[in-house]
Regions:
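Hydrophobic helical h-region of N-terminal Sec-dependent signal peptides
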Residues: 8-14
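Internal interaction segment
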Residues: 134-201
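Bacterial signal peptide processing site
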Residues: 22-24
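Short coil-to-beta strand junction motifs in C2/discoidin
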Residues: 127-132
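Bacterial N-terminal signal peptides that target proteins for export
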Residues: 1-8
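An ectodomain-focused feature that recognizes extracytoplasmic/extracellular
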Residues: 32-125
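C-terminal motif of bacterial Sec signal peptides marking the signal peptidase cleavage site
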Residues: 17-20
């Protein structure tokens, strides 16, 4: 898992992807202490190396759930799971809602996507869902509509260029507004696992 800070479960499957490597920036020591506190003396916590990378792929589901619950908020977290070949970017809001965003795909046959899940791991919203209704992304209150369009990638290109400089990301859907701080936005350029072509979510 790589946290400059970063993470996921889906019950944990959707928010964590089970495993990973996390990279930290200014909060490396703080997050390292949090990670250490997640594990008992009997089950020694993995060490974060000088590059801020920690491998938790062999930890139990319960330990990963605790890690997700304690992950930093208001910033991007990069989760790397070499065993499963899964790479994700997560952003946890103050209320616990998690945004998973995939803008640059490791596999060219996959397409960029996003999803929202509750603090409990319940799916709230996902890209390309025909039943989702209107979705609007706002970057620093500028409306970019829904950049995840099956017919054209032009809106997504605009969104990709703008999000790198944004401070706040908002998503509006079904009369609800979700707000995320865009901390560690440099992680958004990292290639991640995206959605399989033809998949619905």
């Amino acid at each position: 898992m790589y946290i400059k800070p970063w993470i996921t479960l889906g019950g944990l499957a959707a928010v964590l992807g089970l495993g990973g490597c996390q990279t930290l920036s200014n909060t490396t020591e703080k997050v390292s202490d949090q990670v250490t506190g997640l594990f008992s003396s009997k089950d020694k916590a993995p060490k974060i190396d000088k590059d801020g990378v920690v491998d938790i792929s062999k930890k139990t589901l319960e330990q990963l759930e605790k890690f997700t619950a304690s992950m930093p908020t208001q910033q991007w977290v990069y989760i790397e799971n070499e065993q499963l070949g899964r790479y994700q970017l997560k952003n946890k809001a103050q209320d616990g809602v998690i945004l998973t965003l995939a803008l640059h795909c490791k596999i060219s046959s996959q397409r960029p996507t996003f999803s929202l899940s509750s603090a409990e791991g319940k799916p709230l919203l996902k890209a390309y869902d025909p039943n989702a209704g209107q979705i609007q992304f706002l970057l620093d209150n500028q409306n970019y509509g829904n950049p995840f369009n099956v017919h054209t990638d032009e809106p997504l290109k605009r969104f990709q260029a703008a999000i790198a400089q944004a401070k706040v990301i908002k998503i509006f859907n079904a009369s609800r507004l979700y707000t995320f701080q865009n901390g560690n936005a440099d992680l958004l350029s990292k290639p991640v696992s995206c959605q399989e072509s033809g998949a619905s979510g």
